[in-house]
Amino acid sequence: MKTFRFIGMVLLAIVMCVNFASCSDDDEDKTVIEQANLIGKWQSTWEKIHKVENGKEVVTSDEAYTSALLEFKADGTCIESRVEGGYTETSRWSLKDNKLTLSYSDGYSDVLTINELTATKLVLAFEDWDNLDDGSLELDDITTTTYKKID
């Protein structure tokens, strides 16, 4: 009888070990955004724009785009400019999970999704929503821009 009890305990221990080893942490699938990687100057390299028509995404542009500059500073400011000059705008930035919010002095804000952020690469997605006559919103297009760190 003691042998059966011992075998039962061993089998139970094995089942418990297998059960705990097979469980995974759901947080592992989340993209981890390191805020320190965002600080610095970024130049755009590629831009893809896709519209949403009848519920389907249609790519309208997918090409090199190298004129946009973003500089994120540790004090929470962001300077947007163009390589060729002629445009500069300063905003305040904040980061929560993978959502980057740029708040402008006129009270307007843009919320972008960080699809990827490493020490040298940044991929931002911006959703442009239209206000419909009935007060609802409709997704017009999504612009995904890839940047490389330049300093």
Question: For each predicted feature, which ranges?
Answer:
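C-terminal motif of bacterial Sec signal peptides marking the signal peptidase cleavage site
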Residues: 18-22
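Lipid interaction determinants
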Residues: 24-151
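Bacterial N-terminal signal peptides that target proteins for export
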Residues: 1-10
